[in-house]
Amino acid sequence: ATLLQIFARNAKRGTALALENGTAWSSDPRELAAADLYILAVSDAAITTLAESLPIPADAAVVHTAGGIGIEALPARFDRRGVLYPLQTFTQGRSVDFAKIPLFVEGNDDSFTSELEAFARNLSRTVYRADSDRRVRLHLAAVFACNFVNHLYALGGEILHGTELPFDVLKPLIAETAAKAVDSGDPHRVQTGPAVRGDLPTLRRHEAALAHDPRLLRIYESLSQDIWESSKKTSYRPKRSFSTWTA
């Protein structure tokens, strides 16, 4: 497969990406290159508008890259339309090894799904077929495993404010926690902390330390409760009933 063109409104990003990939760039729809496959890597809200506005031939293949949006976001005038969803977080300036990113594909029929699957295997070692319902669940799982977790990192940094301790002190802990979760295959099995242990004195001290910040206290109590409830579904059993913590 050959990348023929980067089409982007942002000239700086578009030209930089085109230069990096040794291809052409344009922001003018009249200069849109003829291609076998058009990949719309834009925000969810922009998918339909962009697909309708570009002069893409009806017999061309068109896909978007959104996890939580179905094929129906693409106009029905395209004979071959689908989804090519990479399960990864992307940030400008950070490189990722695309071969290690799971790709999830769906086409509007079996034939095009097979084509997309073959194309995806040129990009990644891990490719799955996933219809809209499965992708919505997958996208939701990714929000919990990525976006929410990163927010908790930020809250951890907030709690350190005023201690003269940098966020760097948390980095080895973050790395080891993530590594254990990945290696275990079931993060429930490697859950640690006062909530899963039923350590009431520590829970009380933490609650007292957060008494000045109702927002963080609410989050702390909610997560502690859920860790406790989740632990009851595994082979690990805390020594204390959660109801006795809040009594």
Enumerate the predicted regions with their spans:
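Short internal beta-strands
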Residues: 5-9
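Rossmann-like NAD(P)(H) cofactor-binding subdomain of soluble oxidoreductases
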Residues: 11-95
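A general structural signal for well-ordered alpha-helical segments in protein cores
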Residues: 14, 35, 47, 71, ...
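Interdomain hinge/lid region at the active-site interface
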Residues: 177-238
